[in-house]
Amino acid sequence: MPPKKHSGFMMFVNEWRDNNPEGRNLSIAQAVSRCGSIWEKMTAQQRGPYNSGAKNADVLTRVKKERLNCHGQVLSQVELEEREMAESQINMKRCTERIVMDAKRSHDLENTKFVFVAFNYFTKALTTDVYVPAEFSASEYSFNEGIMSVYSTLIDPGQIIFGQGSDAQHHSSTTHNLPLPPNALGEKNMGKLYRNILEYLSKIQEGKDATKPFVVFTKTDMVPVVKSCFRYLACENQDGSYENGDQIQVLDIQYLLFILKKEVLDIAGVSDEKINLYVTDAYFLKDFFEFTPEISCQYHEENDRSKYCTQSLVMRWAYTFSDYMCSDLAISVQPGKHIPPKTKPNYRFYRQPPAGDHLHHPLTCQQTILRLLATLTRKTNFHLSVGGEPPTVALVPSDLTLWDPGIYPLTPVPFMTFLTTTLV
Protein backbone atom coordinates (compact mmCIF):
# COMPACT_ATOMS: atom_id res chain seq x y z
CA MET A 1 0.00 0.00 0.00
CA PRO A 2 1.20 3.54 -0.72
CA PRO A 3 2.03 5.66 2.34
CA LYS A 4 -0.79 7.78 3.77
CA LYS A 5 -0.68 11.44 2.85
CA HIS A 6 -0.26 14.12 5.48
CA SER A 7 -3.17 16.52 6.04
CA GLY A 8 -3.09 20.18 6.90
CA PHE A 9 -5.57 19.61 9.75
CA MET A 10 -3.29 17.07 11.47
CA MET A 11 -0.35 19.44 11.08
CA PHE A 12 -2.45 22.04 12.91
CA VAL A 13 -3.42 19.52 15.64
CA ASN A 14 0.20 18.57 16.29
CA GLU A 15 1.26 22.21 16.49
CA TRP A 16 -1.64 23.01 18.90
CA ARG A 17 -0.64 20.14 21.19
CA ASP A 18 2.99 21.27 21.24
CA ASN A 19 2.20 24.93 22.00
CA ASN A 20 -0.65 24.56 24.53
CA PRO A 21 -0.10 23.08 28.01
CA GLU A 22 -3.70 21.88 27.97
CA GLY A 23 -3.12 19.89 24.75
CA ARG A 24 -0.14 17.97 26.12
CA ASN A 25 -2.42 16.08 28.52
CA LEU A 26 -4.92 15.11 25.81
CA SER A 27 -4.84 12.04 23.60
CA ILE A 28 -4.82 12.33 19.80
CA ALA A 29 -8.56 11.66 19.61
CA GLN A 30 -9.34 14.27 22.27
CA ALA A 31 -7.05 16.83 20.59
CA VAL A 32 -8.74 16.21 17.22
CA SER A 33 -12.15 16.74 18.78
CA ARG A 34 -11.04 19.97 20.48
CA CYS A 35 -9.27 21.37 17.36
CA GLY A 36 -12.09 20.49 14.94
CA SER A 37 -14.20 23.50 15.87
CA ILE A 38 -11.14 25.80 15.71
CA TRP A 39 -10.17 24.50 12.23
CA GLU A 40 -13.69 25.11 10.86
CA LYS A 41 -13.56 28.77 11.87
CA MET A 42 -10.12 29.36 10.23
CA THR A 43 -9.92 31.07 6.82
CA ALA A 44 -8.16 29.59 3.77
CA GLN A 45 -5.29 31.99 4.31
CA GLN A 46 -4.85 30.79 7.90
CA ARG A 47 -4.96 27.16 6.80
CA GLY A 48 -2.41 27.75 4.00
CA PRO A 49 0.82 27.20 5.98
CA TYR A 50 -0.47 23.91 7.38
CA ASN A 51 -1.55 22.60 3.97
CA SER A 52 1.86 23.56 2.50
CA GLY A 53 3.61 21.83 5.38
CA ALA A 54 1.61 18.67 4.68
CA LYS A 55 2.70 18.67 1.01
CA ASN A 56 6.34 19.15 2.01
CA ALA A 57 6.05 16.25 4.44
CA ASP A 58 4.73 14.04 1.62
CA VAL A 59 7.77 14.90 -0.52
CA LEU A 60 10.19 14.13 2.32
CA THR A 61 8.47 10.81 2.90
CA ARG A 62 8.92 9.82 -0.74
CA VAL A 63 12.61 10.77 -0.63
CA LYS A 64 13.15 8.71 2.50
CA LYS A 65 11.61 5.71 0.79
CA GLU A 66 14.32 5.72 -1.96
CA ARG A 67 16.39 2.55 -1.92
CA LEU A 68 19.99 3.02 -0.78
CA ASN A 69 23.13 1.03 -1.48
CA CYS A 70 25.61 -0.14 1.16
CA HIS A 71 27.29 3.29 1.09
CA GLY A 72 24.05 5.12 1.85
CA GLN A 73 23.78 6.51 -1.68
CA VAL A 74 20.44 6.68 -3.48
CA LEU A 75 20.42 3.83 -5.97
CA SER A 76 18.57 5.76 -8.65
CA GLN A 77 21.19 8.52 -8.53
CA VAL A 78 24.05 6.02 -8.69
CA GLU A 79 22.47 4.26 -11.67
CA LEU A 80 21.98 7.60 -13.42
CA GLU A 81 25.66 8.46 -12.96
CA GLU A 82 26.70 5.04 -14.27
CA ARG A 83 24.55 5.48 -17.37
CA GLU A 84 26.02 8.92 -18.01
CA MET A 85 29.55 7.51 -17.60
CA ALA A 86 28.83 4.67 -20.04
CA GLU A 87 27.40 7.10 -22.59
CA SER A 88 30.45 9.32 -22.19
CA GLN A 89 32.77 6.36 -22.85
CA ILE A 90 30.82 5.40 -25.97
CA ASN A 91 30.95 8.97 -27.28
CA MET A 92 34.71 9.14 -26.68
CA LYS A 93 35.27 5.92 -28.62
CA ARG A 94 33.06 7.03 -31.49
CA CYS A 95 34.89 10.34 -31.74
CA THR A 96 38.27 8.58 -31.80
CA GLU A 97 37.10 6.14 -34.47
CA ARG A 98 35.71 8.99 -36.57
CA ILE A 99 39.02 10.90 -36.46
CA VAL A 100 41.04 7.86 -37.55
CA MET A 101 38.59 6.73 -40.24
CA ASP A 102 38.36 10.24 -41.74
CA ALA A 103 42.16 10.35 -41.98
CA LYS A 104 42.27 6.88 -43.55
CA ARG A 105 39.60 7.72 -46.13
CA SER A 106 41.53 10.82 -47.15
CA HIS A 107 44.70 8.67 -47.54
CA ASP A 108 46.52 10.98 -45.15
CA LEU A 109 46.81 8.91 -41.97
CA GLU A 110 50.60 9.30 -41.94
CA ASN A 111 50.33 13.10 -41.77
CA THR A 112 47.39 13.35 -39.35
CA LYS A 113 48.36 15.33 -36.26
CA PHE A 114 47.56 14.13 -32.75
CA VAL A 115 48.02 16.10 -29.53
CA PHE A 116 49.06 14.20 -26.39
CA VAL A 117 48.58 15.99 -23.05
CA ALA A 118 49.29 15.25 -19.38
CA PHE A 119 48.82 17.00 -16.04
CA ASN A 120 50.51 16.55 -12.68
CA TYR A 121 48.46 17.68 -9.68
CA PHE A 122 49.03 18.57 -6.04
CA THR A 123 45.86 17.18 -4.49
CA LYS A 124 42.26 16.15 -5.14
CA ALA A 125 39.17 17.34 -3.27
CA LEU A 126 37.72 14.66 -0.98
CA THR A 127 34.09 14.87 -2.13
CA THR A 128 34.36 16.23 -5.68
CA ASP A 129 36.48 15.65 -8.80
CA VAL A 130 38.48 18.87 -8.39
CA TYR A 131 42.23 18.46 -8.96
CA VAL A 132 44.72 21.26 -8.24
CA PRO A 133 47.17 21.34 -11.21
CA ALA A 134 50.94 21.39 -10.72
CA GLU A 135 52.39 20.82 -14.21
CA PHE A 136 51.16 20.60 -17.80
CA SER A 137 52.71 19.33 -21.02
CA ALA A 138 51.51 18.70 -24.57
CA SER A 139 53.18 17.26 -27.66
CA GLU A 140 52.24 17.46 -31.34
CA TYR A 141 52.77 14.18 -33.18
CA SER A 142 52.32 12.56 -36.58
CA PHE A 143 53.67 9.31 -38.04
CA ASN A 144 55.67 11.02 -40.79
CA GLU A 145 57.20 13.82 -38.73
CA GLY A 146 57.28 12.24 -35.27
CA ILE A 147 57.27 14.81 -32.46
CA MET A 148 56.73 18.18 -34.14
CA SER A 149 56.50 20.44 -31.07
CA VAL A 150 56.29 20.27 -27.27
CA TYR A 151 54.62 22.69 -24.83
CA SER A 152 55.50 22.37 -21.14
CA THR A 153 55.06 24.51 -18.04
CA LEU A 154 55.02 24.25 -14.26
CA ILE A 155 51.95 25.68 -12.51
CA ASP A 156 51.65 27.67 -9.28
CA PRO A 157 47.95 27.63 -8.26
CA GLY A 158 48.67 29.96 -5.33
CA GLN A 159 47.01 27.72 -2.75
CA ILE A 160 45.80 24.18 -2.24
CA ILE A 161 42.52 22.92 -0.83
CA PHE A 162 42.17 23.82 2.86
CA GLY A 163 43.00 20.92 5.17
CA GLN A 164 44.72 18.80 2.51
CA GLY A 165 48.30 19.96 2.95
CA SER A 166 49.41 16.59 4.28
CA ASP A 167 47.78 14.69 1.41
CA ALA A 168 49.35 17.07 -1.10
CA GLN A 169 52.79 16.68 0.48
CA HIS A 170 52.54 12.89 0.44
CA HIS A 171 51.38 12.81 -3.18
CA SER A 172 54.14 15.18 -4.27
CA SER A 173 56.91 13.31 -2.43
CA THR A 174 55.88 9.97 -3.94
CA THR A 175 55.47 11.25 -7.52
CA HIS A 176 56.59 14.51 -9.15
CA ASN A 177 58.24 16.03 -6.04
CA LEU A 178 57.23 19.59 -6.99
CA PRO A 179 57.23 22.13 -4.12
CA LEU A 180 53.80 22.98 -2.71
CA PRO A 181 52.26 26.48 -2.69
CA PRO A 182 53.21 29.11 -1.66
CA ASN A 183 56.63 27.87 -2.81
CA ALA A 184 55.35 26.34 -6.04
CA LEU A 185 57.11 27.04 -9.34
CA GLY A 186 55.78 28.15 -12.70
CA GLU A 187 52.87 30.19 -14.08
CA LYS A 188 50.66 31.88 -11.47
CA ASN A 189 48.00 33.35 -13.76
CA MET A 190 45.59 30.49 -14.47
CA GLY A 191 43.55 32.43 -17.02
CA LYS A 192 46.65 33.42 -18.97
CA LEU A 193 47.90 29.83 -18.93
CA TYR A 194 44.58 28.54 -20.26
CA ARG A 195 44.63 31.08 -23.09
CA ASN A 196 48.21 30.06 -23.95
CA ILE A 197 47.14 26.42 -24.13
CA LEU A 198 44.23 27.30 -26.42
CA GLU A 199 46.56 29.34 -28.61
CA TYR A 200 48.99 26.41 -28.86
CA LEU A 201 46.18 24.02 -29.80
CA SER A 202 44.75 26.45 -32.35
CA LYS A 203 48.10 26.59 -34.18
CA ILE A 204 48.23 22.80 -34.36
CA GLN A 205 44.62 22.26 -35.40
CA GLU A 206 44.52 25.13 -37.87
CA GLY A 207 41.43 25.22 -40.06
CA LYS A 208 39.30 23.46 -37.46
CA ASP A 209 35.57 24.13 -37.31
CA ALA A 210 35.20 26.97 -34.77
CA THR A 211 32.09 25.35 -33.29
CA LYS A 212 33.94 22.13 -32.42
CA PRO A 213 36.33 21.69 -29.47
CA PHE A 214 40.05 20.99 -29.71
CA VAL A 215 40.78 17.27 -29.41
CA VAL A 216 43.58 16.00 -27.16
CA PHE A 217 44.54 12.52 -25.94
CA THR A 218 45.76 11.21 -22.59
CA LYS A 219 46.04 7.94 -20.66
CA THR A 220 42.83 6.18 -19.62
CA ASP A 221 43.34 6.76 -15.90
CA MET A 222 44.35 10.39 -16.48
CA VAL A 223 41.22 11.42 -18.41
CA PRO A 224 39.30 12.68 -15.30
CA VAL A 225 42.45 14.44 -14.04
CA VAL A 226 43.03 16.26 -17.33
CA LYS A 227 39.36 17.25 -17.66
CA SER A 228 39.28 18.60 -14.10
CA CYS A 229 42.55 20.54 -14.50
CA PHE A 230 41.33 22.17 -17.71
CA ARG A 231 38.14 23.24 -15.87
CA TYR A 232 40.29 24.56 -13.02
CA LEU A 233 42.29 26.74 -15.42
CA ALA A 234 39.22 27.84 -17.38
CA CYS A 235 37.21 28.99 -14.34
CA GLU A 236 39.76 31.74 -13.65
CA ASN A 237 39.80 32.94 -17.24
CA GLN A 238 38.27 36.38 -17.70
CA ASP A 239 36.81 35.44 -21.08
CA GLY A 240 33.32 34.11 -20.44
CA SER A 241 33.33 31.97 -23.59
CA TYR A 242 35.91 29.67 -21.98
CA GLU A 243 34.12 29.58 -18.67
CA ASN A 244 33.30 25.86 -18.63
CA GLY A 245 36.45 24.59 -20.31
CA ASP A 246 34.31 23.03 -23.05
CA GLN A 247 36.67 24.13 -25.82
CA ILE A 248 38.94 21.13 -25.18
CA GLN A 249 37.73 17.55 -25.62
CA VAL A 250 39.80 14.91 -23.82
CA LEU A 251 39.93 11.42 -25.38
CA ASP A 252 41.61 8.12 -24.47
CA ILE A 253 45.07 7.65 -26.01
CA GLN A 254 45.05 3.89 -25.33
CA TYR A 255 41.91 3.44 -27.40
CA LEU A 256 43.51 5.62 -30.10
CA LEU A 257 46.51 3.27 -30.16
CA PHE A 258 44.19 0.28 -30.58
CA ILE A 259 42.20 1.82 -33.45
CA LEU A 260 45.32 3.13 -35.19
CA LYS A 261 47.08 -0.24 -34.99
CA LYS A 262 44.13 -2.03 -36.62
CA GLU A 263 43.84 0.54 -39.41
CA VAL A 264 47.59 0.65 -40.00
CA LEU A 265 47.69 -3.13 -40.36
CA ASP A 266 44.74 -2.92 -42.75
CA ILE A 267 46.63 -0.39 -44.88
CA ALA A 268 49.71 -2.64 -44.83
CA GLY A 269 47.60 -5.64 -45.86
CA VAL A 270 48.44 -7.57 -42.68
CA SER A 271 45.92 -9.56 -40.66
CA ASP A 272 44.79 -7.89 -37.42
CA GLU A 273 43.09 -10.93 -35.89
CA LYS A 274 45.48 -11.02 -32.94
CA ILE A 275 45.14 -7.31 -32.20
CA ASN A 276 42.68 -6.35 -29.48
CA LEU A 277 42.44 -3.68 -26.80
CA TYR A 278 44.14 -5.89 -24.19
CA VAL A 279 47.16 -6.43 -26.44
CA THR A 280 47.62 -2.75 -27.29
CA ASP A 281 47.03 -1.70 -23.67
CA ALA A 282 49.67 -4.15 -22.47
CA TYR A 283 52.15 -2.79 -25.01
CA PHE A 284 51.39 0.82 -24.10
CA LEU A 285 51.60 0.27 -20.34
CA LYS A 286 54.99 -1.46 -20.58
CA ASP A 287 56.37 2.03 -21.22
CA PHE A 288 59.59 0.88 -22.90
CA PHE A 289 61.00 4.43 -22.86
CA GLU A 290 60.29 5.03 -19.17
CA PHE A 291 63.93 5.61 -18.21
CA THR A 292 64.96 7.58 -21.29
CA PRO A 293 67.29 10.42 -20.20
CA GLU A 294 67.15 14.07 -21.20
CA ILE A 295 63.53 14.22 -22.36
CA SER A 296 62.03 15.63 -19.14
CA CYS A 297 61.95 19.25 -17.96
CA GLN A 298 64.98 20.76 -16.25
CA TYR A 299 63.48 20.52 -12.75
CA HIS A 300 62.70 16.80 -12.95
CA GLU A 301 65.98 16.04 -14.72
CA GLU A 302 67.92 17.65 -11.88
CA ASN A 303 65.79 15.97 -9.18
CA ASP A 304 65.83 12.50 -10.77
CA ARG A 305 62.05 12.36 -11.18
CA SER A 306 61.92 12.26 -14.97
CA LYS A 307 59.60 9.24 -14.84
CA TYR A 308 56.80 11.45 -13.46
CA CYS A 309 57.51 14.54 -15.58
CA THR A 310 54.60 15.38 -17.89
CA GLN A 311 56.99 16.47 -20.64
CA SER A 312 58.66 13.08 -20.48
CA LEU A 313 55.25 11.37 -20.50
CA VAL A 314 53.93 13.00 -23.67
CA MET A 315 57.23 12.39 -25.48
CA ARG A 316 57.37 8.74 -24.39
CA TRP A 317 53.83 8.20 -25.67
CA ALA A 318 54.90 9.55 -29.05
CA TYR A 319 57.94 7.25 -29.11
CA THR A 320 55.67 4.31 -28.25
CA PHE A 321 53.37 5.08 -31.19
CA SER A 322 56.36 5.28 -33.55
CA ASP A 323 57.93 2.09 -32.24
CA TYR A 324 54.64 0.20 -32.56
CA MET A 325 53.44 1.35 -35.98
CA CYS A 326 56.02 3.18 -38.10
CA SER A 327 57.48 -0.10 -39.39
CA ASP A 328 54.02 -1.16 -40.59
CA LEU A 329 53.81 2.04 -42.65
CA ALA A 330 57.41 1.70 -43.93
CA ILE A 331 58.35 4.99 -42.26
CA SER A 332 62.00 5.32 -41.26
CA VAL A 333 62.39 6.57 -37.71
CA GLN A 334 64.54 9.59 -36.89
CA PRO A 335 66.28 10.05 -33.51
CA GLY A 336 64.75 12.91 -31.58
CA LYS A 337 61.54 12.68 -33.60
CA HIS A 338 60.28 9.10 -33.62
CA ILE A 339 62.68 7.65 -31.07
CA PRO A 340 64.76 9.19 -28.25
CA PRO A 341 67.78 11.23 -29.37
CA LYS A 342 70.07 8.86 -27.47
CA THR A 343 69.16 5.25 -28.23
CA LYS A 344 71.25 2.13 -27.77
CA PRO A 345 71.57 0.00 -30.93
CA ASN A 346 68.85 -2.63 -31.19
CA TYR A 347 70.43 -5.69 -32.84
CA ARG A 348 67.85 -8.00 -34.41
CA PHE A 349 68.65 -11.57 -35.42
CA TYR A 350 66.67 -13.70 -37.79
CA ARG A 351 66.22 -17.46 -38.06
CA GLN A 352 67.86 -19.48 -40.82
CA PRO A 353 65.58 -19.87 -43.88
CA PRO A 354 64.83 -23.22 -45.54
CA ALA A 355 67.55 -24.79 -47.69
CA GLY A 356 68.07 -22.98 -50.97
CA ASP A 357 66.73 -19.65 -49.66
CA HIS A 358 68.83 -16.67 -48.62
CA LEU A 359 68.35 -13.89 -46.13
CA HIS A 360 68.50 -10.52 -47.83
CA HIS A 361 69.99 -7.82 -45.61
CA PRO A 362 70.84 -4.23 -46.53
CA LEU A 363 74.49 -3.26 -46.33
CA THR A 364 73.99 -1.43 -43.03
CA CYS A 365 72.64 -4.62 -41.45
CA GLN A 366 75.66 -6.61 -42.68
CA GLN A 367 78.02 -4.07 -41.19
CA THR A 368 76.13 -4.17 -37.91
CA ILE A 369 76.36 -7.97 -37.74
CA LEU A 370 80.07 -8.01 -38.54
CA ARG A 371 80.70 -5.35 -35.89
CA LEU A 372 78.87 -7.44 -33.33
CA LEU A 373 80.85 -10.54 -34.26
CA ALA A 374 84.10 -8.66 -33.79
CA THR A 375 82.89 -7.59 -30.35
CA LEU A 376 82.04 -11.19 -29.42
CA THR A 377 85.48 -12.29 -30.56
CA ARG A 378 87.09 -10.03 -27.98
CA LYS A 379 84.83 -11.36 -25.24
CA THR A 380 85.37 -15.12 -25.85
CA ASN A 381 88.28 -17.53 -26.12
CA PHE A 382 87.19 -18.62 -29.57
CA HIS A 383 88.27 -17.17 -32.90
CA LEU A 384 85.59 -16.19 -35.37
CA SER A 385 86.29 -16.47 -39.09
CA VAL A 386 84.56 -13.69 -41.01
CA GLY A 387 85.10 -13.45 -44.75
CA GLY A 388 84.16 -14.61 -48.18
CA GLU A 389 81.99 -13.09 -50.89
CA PRO A 390 79.21 -13.00 -49.93
CA PRO A 391 80.41 -12.88 -46.28
CA THR A 392 80.06 -16.01 -44.14
CA VAL A 393 80.81 -16.71 -40.48
CA ALA A 394 81.98 -19.94 -38.79
CA LEU A 395 83.86 -21.45 -35.82
CA VAL A 396 81.42 -20.50 -33.05
CA PRO A 397 80.52 -22.67 -30.00
CA SER A 398 77.28 -24.49 -30.77
CA ASP A 399 75.80 -23.80 -27.32
CA LEU A 400 76.04 -20.00 -27.68
CA THR A 401 72.56 -18.51 -28.11
CA LEU A 402 70.99 -15.11 -28.65
CA TRP A 403 67.42 -13.91 -28.45
CA ASP A 404 65.42 -13.14 -31.54
CA PRO A 405 63.27 -10.14 -30.42
CA GLY A 406 62.18 -9.28 -33.94
CA ILE A 407 60.46 -12.49 -34.94
CA TYR A 408 60.23 -14.88 -31.98
CA PRO A 409 60.04 -12.87 -28.73
CA LEU A 410 61.50 -14.76 -25.78
CA THR A 411 62.62 -17.65 -28.06
CA PRO A 412 66.37 -18.53 -28.10
CA VAL A 413 67.94 -18.92 -31.55
CA PRO A 414 71.11 -21.09 -31.83
CA PHE A 415 73.85 -18.68 -32.71
CA MET A 416 75.72 -21.36 -34.66
CA THR A 417 72.74 -21.76 -36.97
CA PHE A 418 72.59 -18.04 -37.61
CA LEU A 419 76.31 -17.61 -38.20
CA THR A 420 76.43 -20.32 -40.85
CA THR A 421 73.63 -18.61 -42.77
CA THR A 422 74.75 -17.04 -46.07
CA LEU A 423 74.19 -13.27 -46.13
CA VAL A 424 73.46 -11.62 -49.44
From Swiss-Prot:
One of its GO terms (cellular component) is P granule. It holds the Pfam family Maelstrom. It comes from the Eukaryota. InterPro entries: HMG_box_dom_sf, Maelstrom, Protein_maelstrom. Belongs to the maelstrom family. Involved both in the piRNA and miRNA metabolic processes. As a component of the meiotic nuage, plays a central role during oogenesis by repressing transposable elements and preventing their mobilization, which is essential for the germline integrity. Repression of transposable elements is mediated via the piRNA metabolic process, which mediates the repression of transposable elements during meiosis by forming complexes composed of piRNAs and Piwi proteins and governs the repression of transposons. Residues 2-69 bind DNA. The lineage of its organism: Eukaryota, Metazoa, Ecdysozoa, Arthropoda, Hexapoda. This is Protein maelstrom 1. It comes from Drosophila ananassae.
